[in-house]
Amino acid sequence: MRTLWIMAVLLVGVEGHLLQFRKMIKKMTGKEPIVSYAFYGCYCGKGGRGKPKDATDRCCFVHDCCYEKVTGCDPKWDYYTYSLENGDIVCGGDNPCTKVVCECDKAAAICFRDNLKTYKKRYMTFPDIFCTDPTEKC
């Protein structure tokens, strides 16, 4: 299912903040997010179940949990404002909802950066049918 979602995003073009999130990840990690994170582990990309496979996958789990707390806007499609100041992501704007979304994305991008040393290529295209452990709660 998450493969279809990612392909749909690629075919229609990235709108809203997904492009912003991609840029944040690229800036923090130097990796191309669609290749490196879109199908990583059990939680990166669309959906998620089971137990995160490693620290990078846990970044995605925490990001999903962060999005679950967002109310009043659509975390995947609404634009937010951010800037880079001395290499740091600074979320801005007057809309409290989109600012929270930006903070969720910022935390995930930093988490990916902080866990680059434990990133495992074997989880890059991990089939979600192997995510069979009990699903953790946020």
Curated annotation (Swiss-Prot):
Major location (coarse): secreted
Instruction: Provide the binding site for Ca(2+).
Output: 43, 45, 47, 64
Give the matching Pfam families: Phospholip_A2_1
**Molecular function in Gene Ontology:** calcium ion binding; calcium-dependent phospholipase A2 activity; phospholipid binding; toxin activity
Listed under GO cellular component are: extracellular region
Cofactor binding comment, as recorded: Binds 1 Ca(2+) ion.
Name the UniProt record assigns to this protein: Basic phospholipase A2 PL-Y
Q: What organism is the protein native to?
A: Protobothrops flavoviridis
